[in-house]
Amino acid sequence: TQWGTPYFIAWTTTPWTLPSNTALCVGPKINYVCVQTYNPYNGEKISVVLAESRMSAYFKADGAKIALEDYNPGDKVVPYKVVGKYTGEELVGMRYTQLMPWVKPLEKVDDLAADFVKKVAEEHPERCFTVGTDRFVELEAEGFRVIPGDYVTTDDGTGIVHIAPTFGADDAKVAKAAGIPSLFMINKKGETRPMVDLVGKYYTIDECAPEFVAACVNEENYAHHAGDFVKNAYSPKYNVGGKYDAEAAEKDEDLNIVIC
């Protein structure tokens, strides 16, 4: 029986990379559960998937004794009910909605491109675009899948790992093996770059190639954080005269909190 909106609960120590997410990784041999419960922040009905062995980190034991229908927003103990059990292998291949639909995944189409990239470009020329002399293909339909990864553990987190191929060797390796595209920006020089620039801020739309923006960027969604620094520590606002004001930075709301 459907209970609210279904979610995978993913784990990351770098929330600012979430807009670059293109996959979720599970351990094939890990046991997972589907839990009907409520969002403790807004009281909405939700169904969540996470590793069975990590349930105690997020759900109080008393919650299993309370009927879902008896919950009132604000109650200290949130009720829950386990309604399904799966192995990670059974979850592989499931699709999900892009968490932050700012930019669509894409890849460069050249001799070094993966076979799946070349195939999509050949079968869907309408999804291809050119910046300078380089050809790219938009790959939204090929991303946002659950993929396997033997390195996923249940030592902490949820047993589900957020994958952003442009931020980390492990992410790039497991994504490539599963045929998952990357998500990056293309500047006006035609250079491909991660969403975050070298000074720690999201690229502005004006810095990007117009062909790339037209094909892959949701300007309305992206505009809310374009140009924002991903950590207060990187912002000139807290680095006046070469001196970092740690106290002020810690008091102000950090982007890692804002986007979550």
Name what the model sees in each region.
Residues 2-8, 15-260:
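Non-cofactor substrate-recognition interfaces
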